[in-house]
């Protein structure tokens, strides 16, 4: 958005908007000429390292199999949810995080997004084939803090992106398997016995 703002300041509102539109069209043409993408596995590794590497360090002292750490991550989810909802009032296109009460029975922290700017961008710019690379990284990130993510969908393949986080040794973690859906998203499916 900085570039668009700069164009408007330099060339005026109308001309700045025209230039921004031309830039976007040119960029779209450029994307059509890009060579084939590398294998998904290679891209997944890159995206995961880029966005989730902090979880490796965090996992050295944070362990979701400890009740205090589960309580703490729930508090973090609650605070982030409060912050997101305040931002949502000011910036309606941002993440909309809905915190859920801590599940004391199952020792599970839950929240969900009803809106994700990454998913909206991917839909608008026909980049849905890339979106799973970002969404799927969450599983790896949570595993680095000795947890398991149980997710039924994301804003890319469902009406919400749900997070149910439990310790990796929690019996609930063993009730699910992670599968890849037809669009490339990792999702949790309850095991049938």
Task: Please tell me what each predicted stretch does.
Residues 140, 178-193:
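Short, cationic low-complexity segments
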Residues 149, 171-184:
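Domain-exit/linker segments immediately C-terminal to small folded modules
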Residues 152, 158-168:
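C-terminal edge-of-domain segments
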Residues 9-13, 17-124:
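Amphipathic interaction/junction segments at domain boundaries or subunit interfaces
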Residues 7, 136, 169-171:
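An N-terminal assembly and electron-transfer interface module characteristic of large anaerobic redox
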């Amino acid at each position: 958005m900085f570039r668009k703002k700069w164009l408007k300041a330099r060339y005026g509102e109308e001309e700045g908007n025209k230039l921004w539109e031309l830039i976007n069209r040119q960029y779209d043409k450029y994307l059509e000429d890009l060579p084939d993408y590398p294998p998904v596995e290679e891209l997944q590794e890159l995206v995961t390292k880029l966005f989730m590497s902090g979880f490796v360090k965090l996992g050295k002292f944070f362990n979701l199999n400890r009740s205090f750490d589960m309580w703490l991550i729930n508090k973090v989810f609650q605070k982030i949810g409060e912050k997101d909802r305040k931002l949502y009032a000011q910036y309606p296109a941002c993440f909309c995080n809905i915190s859920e009460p801590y599940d004391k029975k199952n020792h599970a922290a839950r929240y969900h997004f009803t809106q994700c700017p990454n998913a909206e961008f991917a839909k608008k710019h026909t980049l849905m084939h890339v979106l799973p690379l970002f969404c799927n990284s969450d599983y790896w990130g949570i595993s680095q803090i000795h947890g398991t993510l149980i997710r039924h969908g994301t804003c890319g393949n469902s009406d919400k992106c749900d997070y149910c986080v439990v310790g990796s040794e929690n019996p609930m973690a063993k009730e699910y398997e992670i599968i890849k859906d037809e669009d490339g998203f990792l999702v949790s499916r309850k095991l049938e016995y």
